[in-house]
């Protein structure tokens, strides 16, 4: 393991790098060697450790980020939960494989490994079971003392994988809002998600009734007028609807309200979306910081006992007519039809 140590006000920061196997569970073993020649046997795992001055002898706690697809938090200055945790632990912020500095994954890298079946097998090497195995290798590299684990959201799925695969390495386990089922199908998760999303939509428009006509105006405009995000992609009505992810957050109603502020202006007599509005929406819907989120989010709910998820989120949406999508070819007229349905 390679370490680099830095002195910060009140803290020592240590950056750890460790080489670990890519394919821990044989996902690539069914392919011939020449089919996987572009795939490395090992990848570099990165973690950043913080130690408060005077607390060098405290036990370690490793933090697993939510997602999937997001790296460990980069905090400057140190605050929030980390500030409190450092009074009790040396805290290790792990970049889970495929994120941050731990062999980050993006579309070009996946395309380069081979044909679609190889790509799918490659992506499967970045699940929570492999992340838990990486963490165990890191713990052993630190000397093997049991440590505490803390998982937020998807990080809780990693914690349960650690409890299953290497309980001997754990002194404590903390989970915040991420406890997976051991037998339920992804369909069950998405039925609950759509039902709760409907509730949150109603809460939002009850609190901010003026935002409902604004949202419909934007959707209808996007159905007929080409608008581009700062990154160059076209903003479609379907992608605009993805800002509803805010509704899953504690203060999401306010965040969504702020996103919808003052979307339009007039340019040479034409009604267009403001650049500032497009920038806010682009930042909200972009998966550029965490491309694995879009690819693997449904897969984290998979169970060996229930089989493939089979595009569960899309299938289950069909059970909820309030989330029916309009006919894209019909343009704004289809959006108006949906609006009239209430």
What residues fall within each predicted segment?
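Gly/Pro-rich cap/lid or specificity-loop segments adjacent to the active site
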Residues: 2, 7-232, 340
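Alpha/beta-hydrolase fold active-site neighborhood
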Residues: 226-342
